[in-house]
């Protein structure tokens, strides 16, 4: 059998196949099933400060293409809507039960030094292998001056990355937003701030369709809609310099 062991940003893993931060990595039972199936690691769904956000429902929209139904999914989900303590306890159990797997925790808090320095020791105490700074969420959180609102300003990317590197022993991965004219700028900023790696990419702003009766983007909730995220490979340019 081939040896697929690898080290990514200082994080060891039995294979390079990881689940990205997303709805499937929001709960212990989902992550446990994935690791039992052989995945080499997971990035836990983005954690934030308490009180937890409130997610709407339904928050998914389907894209059909060339006669194929549900060729892609759009989502307007925010970060985890569960209490921080609940996630922390589950992450700790997962790492104890799967010590050889890469467990990375995605984080998003206000662009305030005290907020970042406060949450890092809590996450580090789980025994996880690293953190991912979510600078890419294109909807819901950017309106709160988080997510893509940080990722679109290279100076902020470098500043927050440096705060985290000064505070934690864990490897720091920076997740970039593609919703920017030149993705190289925040990539350079992350590396200047000391990032151990960059993660490509967060979701691209998109509209899957329009409810012609309500004249709102899909998915629509209570007669209202918004643009959401649609994943797309966008990795060539940022990888060339490194």
For the regions a language model picked out, list residue spans one by one.
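Active-site entrance/lid segments in N-terminal catalytic domains of soluble metabolic enzymes
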Residues: 3-13, 18-24, 28-193, 200-229
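Single conserved hydrophobic/aromatic residue that forms the stacking wall/gate
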Residues: 233-242
